């Protein structure tokens, strides 16, 4: 089980595993060349720092915070999470890209809520060795926090 919390400007989480996934501190500099699977390249974005497994020079973030103070964590949601097929007319983001997708362009939870309105989190695996993780997400800034859950009946966004 994973737990995340935020209070004022503090954001944190734990990763309750008795073994390592090779996690490390990862820093994605401002304007890093993100290549999203189903979207155009992100040429201008915020810097991000967090914990990730870095594979093939790509940070698979567990949790992170951007330079504006917006934090996001992916937490276990096994048996409940359901990600979707690519949908025309939506911003289709693979689940493994969801954290950098939000943190690269949003400075606040308020901005994240607007971006989420047209976001479709896709069941696209990183590669054959990394299946889609069953997660839900907490997004927080110093003023508010939300939980994002992708389930069989759609994406739900809850004030937290």
What is the predicted role of each segment?
Residues 14-16, 76-77, 117, 142, ...:
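An acidic- and aromatic-residue-enriched active-site/binding cleft used to recognize and process polar
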Residues 125-129:
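Surface-exposed patches in mature extracellular/periplasmic domains of secreted proteins
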Residues 1-90, 123:
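A contiguous strand-loop segment
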Residues 65-67, 94, 132:
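Short, solvent-exposed loop/turn segments at the edges of secondary structure
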Residues 131-160:
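Extended amphipathic alpha-helical segments with heptad-repeat/coiled-coil character used for oligomerization
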Residues 14, 64, 102-105, 120, ...:
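Residue-level preference for alpha-helix termini and adjacent loops
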Residues 29, 130-131:
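Residue-level signal for alpha-helical context at structural boundaries
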Residues 88-122:
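Alpha/propeptide regions of enzymes that mature by internal proteolysis
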